[in-house]
Regions:
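Short C-terminal tail/terminal secondary-structure segment
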Residues: 2-5, 151, 230, 241-262
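Conserved glycine-rich cofactor-binding loop
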Residues: 12, 19-21
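Substrate-binding pocket helix/loop in short-chain dehydrogenase/reductase
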Residues: 102-103, 110-115, 206, 210
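Active-site loop immediately N-terminal to the catalytic Tyr-X3-Lys motif
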Residues: 104, 151-157, 179-180, 217, ...
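Active-site helix of classical SDR
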Residues: 126, 162
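Alpha-helical segment proximal to the catalytic Tyr-Lys
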Residues: 131, 175-179, 238
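Residue(s) in the substrate-gating loop at a strand-loop-helix junction
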Residues: 146
Length: 262
């Protein structure tokens, strides 16, 4: 198979939530495949170290401040990205947040903060970018979901609702924008260590418990998602849209051990 199907040379990708964690995993993978980037965060100065890293790979990275809870901030980001490169080919819709609490302790403000960021923000970022993609007749939108897009976990009620919503939103936008040459898919990671959950990974007993539940017997590593995000961004996925692609080591199978541990 030709490497051209996975080559992103000459492509421009926006990666939201790129100051840490998954956003940097995705941005790094796209840059290594040849893409130039627009990287965003609510705090502009938090992007500068990652900008330098991408430039050391020989690619360009334009940092832009973005608050996905603000319509004005979203439109400004999309306009700046368009101005910087003259086009937008790829969007990795990654910005998100979480609050871990028992469902009975979730407040109105907790719910709104998570849904406004993860679901409403993702929609309006996609909308602003899609307008520019549609004008050119080409685009790849990759919404970032989670294993919680298909499974429920105690202590994550609003987060799970937001990620389930991302899955449904992806299908709707794919149906809406496919005729314009824009594909919309959802990449759903399983358990990967990030800033949001690093405290949990410091508990060795919990990591052992988690690993035992994953068919591949370990949590995800950063480069486990590299080929997937590049695939969804590249020509290789040109006839795939509206799909959820889980990268989770199999934990979403929900398997219960029916045999004794060996």
């Amino acid at each position: 198979m030709s490497n051209e199907l996975f080559d992103l040379s000459g492509r421009v990708a926006i990666v939201t939530g790129a100051s840490r964690g998954l956003g940097q995993y995705f941005g790094r993978a796209l840059a290594k495949a040849g893409a130039d980037l627009v990287i965003t965060s609510r705090h502009l100065d938090s992007l500068f170290p990652f900008q330098k890293e991408i430039e050391e790979l020989g690619r360009r990275a334009v940092p832009v401040e973005l608050d996905v809870r603000s319509a004005e901030s979203i439109e400004r980001m999309a306009a700046l990205a368009q101005e910087a490169y003259g086009k937008i080919d790829i969007l990795v819709n990654n910005a998100g947040m979480n609050i871990r609490k028992p469902a009975l302790d979730i407040t109105w403000d907790d719910w709104n903060a998570i849904l406004d960021t993860n679901l409403r923000g993702s929609f309006f970022v996609a909308q602003a970018v899609a307008r520019r993609m549609i004008a050119r007749g080409y685009g790849r939108i990759i919404n970032i979901g989670s294993v919680t897009s298909v499974a429920g976990y105690a202590g994550l009620a609003p987060y799970t609702a937001s990620r389930g919503g991302i899955r449904q939103l992806t299908m709707s936008l794919a149906d809406d924008w496919g005729k314009f040459g824009v594909t919309v898919n959802c990449l759903a990671p399983g358990w990967f260590r990030t800033e949001q959950n690093k405290v949990m990974y410091e508990d060795k007993e919990w990591v052992e418990y988690l690993s035992d539940r994953i068919p591949m017997k370990r949590p995800g590593k950063p480069d486990d998602m590299d080929s997937t995000v590049v695939f969804l961004a590249a020509e290789s996925s040109r006839y795939i849209t509206g799909q959820l692609l889980l990268v989770d080591g199999g934990i979403s199978t929900g398997a219960v051990r029916a045999l004794p541990r060996k």
